[in-house]
Each structure stands twice: as C-alpha cells, then as structure tokens.
C-alpha cells in the first residue's frame, strides 16, 4: 500500500466498553486531527492559500517546461527539485480539498440539525393552532347554546305579575333576581298548560259526542238516498217532456269540475248562452273522467315513490339507452299532449243539419284546438266542384278575417317548438285540430303579440263578449256551405237555380247558357292573363276557392273565373271575364267587358235576394248570361255579310250605345222589361 493511500485513510479510533477513546487514540488525535484543524483554520486564508498554491504550480510547470525545452545536463537536477516542490504543492491542494469536504459535511450537519429544530417548532405550532381552533369551536358552541326554555313563548312580565298568584310570582324575590323571575314565569307557564290540557280533554270528549251525532244523522241521510234515486228516476220522463234534463245537467256540472280553466270557461259560457238565447245549441263534455281526476291527485307517500323510483332505475339500467330520435319523439308527444276531457258544441240548424265542434286543450302549449264534423239533414248529391266546401279542415277557415288556423296563436310556443325540433304546428293539425284565434277567445284566452307569456289566465268576460257573434258566424257558415253545395251540383249540370223571389231580377227569356263549371287551383288562377287586376288589388288569396265557368251562345264563348271567399256571402264573389268572339276580349281591351264585370262585382247587392243572401252566386251567374245576350244582340251587324243575323235582337233597349266608350245598356228594368244605361 502506498504512502498516499495511508494518508487518505482516517485514523482508527478504538473505544473501550464505556464508549470512550483510549489514551493511545487521544495521542493520535492530538498529533493529527483534520476535523479539529477545520475549526481552527480560517476558510478565507485557506482560499487564499489555494490561489497562491495554484499560481505556484503554474509557475513551476512553466519553468519545468522551459528547462525541458532547453535540455542540458545541469537542468535535470533542477527539474527534479522543481518536481519535489510541485508534489508539495499538490499535497497542499489535497489537504485543502479534504478540509473543504469536511467543512461541507459540517455545514450540512448543522443545516440538518437546524431544520430538525424548525420542524419540531413547526409541529408544536400546528398543535397549538389546532388546540386554539378546538377551543374556539367549543367557545362558539357554548355561545350558541340555547336552552329549551328560550323556545317557549312566555307571557310578558307585566301580564305575569298581574295574572299569576303571589305564591308563584313571589314579587319580593323575583323583582330583583332575573333568574328567579324566569323560573317563576316557567312555573306559571306550566300551570297554564295544565289548565289548557284539562280544557283540551273536555273539548275532545265534546267532539266525540258530536261526531257520534253526525254519524247517526249521516246514516239517516244515507237511508234517504235510495228513495231520492227512485224519485229522480220517476221524474226523468217529466224532465224530458219539459226539456229540462236536470239529472244530465247535474252530471255534466260534476264532470266540469275536472276541466282545465279554458275549457271550463267555454263550457260555462256556452251553456249560459244556450239556456238564455239559443236552445238549438247543445253543450256536452266528453272524454275520460278518471284520467282527468288523476291529473289533480296529490302525490302518494314518499316512501312508495322512492321504492318505485329505485325499481325504475334498476330496470332502466338493464334496458338499452334510447336513441336521440326516440327521445325527441317522446318529448314531442308529451309537448302535444291533450287534456283527457273535451267540450263538444252541437249547432242545429232549422233544416236539421248539425255542426259538431269538439274543443281540445293542449296542456303544455296552453292553447285550444277544434275539430269539426258535419251532419247534413239530407243526403247531398255528389258535386266535384263542391269537394272542399264541407271539408272539415277548410269549412271554418277565415271565420274571422285572416284567421286560417294553421299557426299557433301563443308566441311562447315558438320557443317550445325550437327545443324539441318542431318546425310548425301545421304538420300536426290533422291530429290535434285547428288552433283558431276565435277558439282561444271562446275559451277566454288572449295572447298578446308583443311578448310571449307561458301562462295565460282564462277570462270569462272575454269569452262572453264573443260567444253570440261566433255562434252566429258558425251557423251562417254551415248554412252557406250547404247552400253552395246544392248550387254547385246544379251548376255542374249546366242549370242555374234561380228562386221565385229572384225571378224579377232577370228577363223571362235568357238565351245564353252555362255549359261548364269546375274548380281550379290558385296557381291556375294566377296564370290567367285577365285576372291580373284582381291579383294586384289583393282580392285573391290562397285561402280562397277558385272556379272556372263557361257561358256559350252560338259561336261566342264567355270564359270567367270566380274568387270565392271563405266568408261567402258576407264577402261577395269576384268575377273576371274574357270573351272569345271575333278575337279575345277582356276588360283590358274592351270597355263593355269591364262594365259587365262591374255589373256583377260592384252592384252585387241587387242580386243578394232574400236574407241571408245565399243565392248571390247563382244570381251573379244568371246576370252574366243576361249580360252576354245584351252584349251580342247590341253588337253591330256587318251588312256586307249575307244571311240572317247570328244574334237577332230580342231585348228592348232604349239606347244601344252611350258616351265615347260606346258602352251598352246592361241594366235591366223591372217590370217594364227594357234595358238601359246606369
């Protein structure tokens, strides 16, 4: 082993049984102990020594390098001497390195000891903070403690001293001691409660006695029920004979309690109007009463609900999760759900025809809808052009102007539809019914257009103010459509029905004949060139019905299209004409055609006939036939053509032409029987 390795080894310390060093070890530690030397030496001086030693080493190395470069015999001794000096400096550097490591170890040990002390102090601090927090909680609990007597509402001090006996109040003691005063007040409260308990027992006994008397009277009244039922059954024929069905009305009123507010308002107001003004209006309630009662039942016991919900959760976890489409369909069905009960109005007409209106309430949309069913008194003949007249989806369209029943009147429904992906209520009208605005009014509902309101209260006054007018409009609409149906059946066969009351409006002989009558679409009407003026005036709408007619006499053909408003006959039909004879003539190029149109469109009041004016359309068509005769018979005859006139004059006219426009005399004067200008 080399001498350097011996120097690097730490001195061996032998300890005796008591853990103390031996004398030999103490002598070695006294001679050489670098750990002790570290405490004595100054680190700055060691650092300076380190720098000086490094400089000396650099110097010696450069000198040795110079000597080697020179070469020579004398320089070898000098190089060896300098090597020895360099080794001494290396030994010094090694010692300084060991001293630096010892200092580092001592600094780490001191830092570790200081850290342990800090951790110990920090742990003590945490324990003390926990104790402080625990004590604060205990103090808070003590401060928040409330005795039971604080929850008892005691009588006031003045009332206590005025009512309590002296044996309990003890004013000589309690007036100065608040604790004794509270105890005395509690004693007085106990005494009062004992007295009230006695009174309570007496009241319970009295209650039991009264309940027994009530049970006896109930049994007596129940024994009368079979007799009353037999009396009611015996009075049913009398009620039917007098048209006073009290029993049925009573059942209806019992069922009406389960109606939603809008249907209830409709039922009450319609029943009141029927009893007061219109005996031919029958109001009934239909639907499942049990389901309606279930809607108002209070929820069952919470425990049962919890057990049911747990069972449902277990089942749903086992089932497969429904897809998004199925969830949306379920939400739509729930959104469009109707109330189990509905109100039916049956309007009877004089001729025996009935109009059945069934009103439904959509609970989540908060709107009313109606479905229509028509029962004619007589079997109607089939007429192709009358196909949509009695269509349940169209017969009530535009009962009030602009109310086609294709959109929801509640603005809040738009936001509800957006959430579940419903684009329009029109797709579900065939199933739910039409939500006309007048239907909402009959139910007392009013929806402001400026702001959506999810909850609207049914108003009895609103329903009552519109009930009579709406019923009259409904009955008039049914009668007008039935009358039009019969008229269309005759028109399709080329016959124009004119009643006896209206015979005086036309001459005895009308030669022109109706040869064609059929229905056309709105698009077909728009495509005709001679309907442009009517379209520009806004007199033709999609909700109207359109018909084509052809009147012929000889080679002349009068083509006409009719705009039939749903409000016929309050709103008259509008005619547009085109004559095919010696060219095509219309109101745009022939003033007489324009005058013919005005005779039926402007002076329609002359053709209404007896009220309510259901013969207006057929009278207008008959007048067109008469006007075509006048037009053709007053036309100039070409003398260059030989042979008889195609249209010989048979009408008496005071003057054939008038004015620069050369208009013809189209006004018929009864009873003189001649034609003149207006």
From Swiss-Prot:
Biased composition (Acidic residues): 301-314
GO biological process, one term: cell differentiation
Chief place where the protein resides: nucleus
Pfam family, one: FmiP_Thoc5
InterPro entries in the cross-refs: THO_Thoc5
Molecular functions (GO terms): RNA binding
UniProt subcellular location: Nucleus; Nucleus speckle; Cytoplasm
Keywords: Cytoplasm, Differentiation, mRNA processing, mRNA splicing, mRNA transport, Nucleus, RNA-binding, Transport
Motif Nuclear localization signal: positions: 7-10
Annotated segments matching region Disordered: 1-37, 294-329
Keyword Glycoprotein: no
Keyword Amino-acid biosynthesis: no
Biased composition (Basic and acidic residues): 14-37
Top-level lineage group: Eukaryota
Functional note: Component of the THO subcomplex of the TREX complex which is thought to couple mRNA transcription, processing and nuclear export, and which specifically associates with spliced mRNA and not with unspliced pre-mRNA. Plays a key structural role in the oligomerization of the THO-ddx39b complex.
Protein family per UniProt: Belongs to the THOC5 family.
Record's subunit section: Component of the THO subcomplex, which is composed of thoc1, thoc2, thoc3, thoc5, thoc6 and thoc7. Component of the transcription/export (TREX) complex at least composed of alyref/thoc4, ddx39b, sarnp/cip29, chtop and the THO subcomplex. Interacts with thoc7.
PANTHER family the UniProt entry points to: FMS INTERACTING PROTEIN, THO COMPLEX SUBUNIT 5 HOMOLOG
Name used for this protein in its record: THO complex subunit 5 homolog
Gene name per UniProt: thoc5
């Amino acid at each position: 082993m080399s001498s350097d390795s011996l120097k690097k080894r730490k001195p061996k310390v032998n300890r005796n049984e008591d853990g103390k060093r031996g004398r030999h070890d103490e002598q070695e530690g006294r001679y050489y102990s670098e750990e002790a030397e570290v405490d004595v030496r100054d680190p700055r001086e060691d650092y300076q020594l380190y720098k000086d030693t490094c400089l000396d080493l650099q110097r010696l190395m450069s000198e040795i390098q110079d000597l080697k470069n020179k070469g020579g015999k004398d320089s070898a001794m000098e190089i060896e001497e300098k090597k020895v000096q360099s080794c001494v400096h290396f030994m010094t550097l090694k010692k300084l390195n060991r001293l630096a490591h010892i200092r580092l170890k001592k600094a780490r040990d001191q830092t570790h000891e200081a850290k342990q002390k800090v951790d110990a102090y920090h742990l003590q601090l945490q324990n003390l903070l926990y104790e402080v927090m625990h004590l604060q909680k205990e103090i808070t609990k003590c401060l928040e403690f409330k005795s039971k007597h604080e929850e008892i509402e005691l009588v006031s001090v003045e009332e206590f001293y005025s009512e309590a006996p002296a044996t309990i109040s003890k004013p000589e003691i309690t007036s100065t001691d608040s604790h004794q005063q509270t105890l005395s007040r509690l004693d007085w409260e106990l005494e009062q409660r004992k007295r009230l308990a006695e009174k309570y027992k007496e009241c319970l006994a009295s209650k039991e006695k009264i309940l027994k008397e009530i049970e006896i009277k109930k049994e007596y009244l129940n024994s009368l029920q079979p007799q009353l039922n037999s009396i009611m059954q015996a009075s049913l024929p009398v009620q039917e004979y007098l048209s006073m069905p009290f029993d049925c009305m009573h059942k209806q009123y019992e069922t009406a309690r389960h109606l939603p507010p809008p249907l209830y308002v409709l039922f009450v107001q319609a029943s009141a109007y029927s009893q007061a003004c219109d005996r031919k209006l029958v109001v009934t309630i239909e639907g499942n009463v049990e389901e309606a009662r279930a809607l108002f039942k209070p929820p069952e016991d919470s425990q049962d609900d919890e057990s049911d919900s747990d069972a449902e959760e277990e089942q749903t976890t086992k089932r497969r999760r429904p897809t998004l489409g199925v969830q949306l369909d379920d939400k739509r069905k729930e959104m469009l759900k109707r109330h189990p009960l509905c109100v039916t109005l049956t309007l009877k007409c004089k001729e025996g025809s009935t109009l059945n209106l069934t009103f439904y309430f959509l609970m989540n949309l908060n709107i009313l809808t109606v479905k229509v069913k028509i029962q004619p008194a007589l079997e109607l003949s089939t007429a192709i052009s009358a196909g949509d007249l009695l269509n349940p989806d169209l017969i009530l369209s535009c009962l009030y102007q602009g109310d086609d029943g294709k959109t929801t009147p509640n603005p809040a429904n738009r936001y509800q539809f957006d959430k579940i992906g419903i684009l329009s209520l029109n797709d579900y009208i065939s199933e739910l019914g039409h939500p006309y605005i007048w239907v909402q009014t009959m139910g007392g509902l009013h929806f402001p257009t400026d702001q959506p309101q999810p909850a609207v209260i049914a108003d009895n006054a609103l329903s009552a103010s519109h009930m009579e007018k709406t019923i009259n409009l409904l009955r008039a609409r049914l009668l007008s459509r039935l009358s039009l149906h019969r008229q269309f059946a005759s028109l399709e066969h080329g016959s124009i029905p004119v009643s006896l009351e209206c015979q005086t409006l036309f001459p005895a002989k009308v030669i022109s004949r109706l040869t064609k009558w059929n229905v056309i679409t709105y698009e077909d009407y728009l495509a005709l060139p001679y309907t442009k003026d009517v379209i520009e005036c806004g007199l033709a709408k999609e909700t109207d019905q359109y018909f084509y007619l052809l009147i012929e006499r000889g080679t002349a053909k009068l083509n006409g299209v009719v705009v039939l408003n749903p409000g016929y006959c309050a709103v008259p039909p509008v005619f547009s004409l085109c004559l095919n004879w010696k060219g095509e003539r219309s109101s745009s190029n022939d003033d007489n055609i324009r005058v013919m149109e005005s005779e039926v469109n402007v002076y329609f009041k002359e053709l209404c006939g007896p009220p309510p004016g259901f013969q207006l359309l057929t009278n207008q068509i008959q007048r067109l036939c008469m006007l075509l005769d006048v037009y053709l018979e007053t036309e100039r005859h070409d003398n260059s053509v030989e042979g008889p006139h195609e249209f010989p004059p048979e009408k008496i006219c005071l003057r054939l032409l008038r004015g620069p426009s050369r208009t013809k005399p189209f006004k018929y004067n009864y009873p003189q029987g001649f034609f003149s200008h207006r």
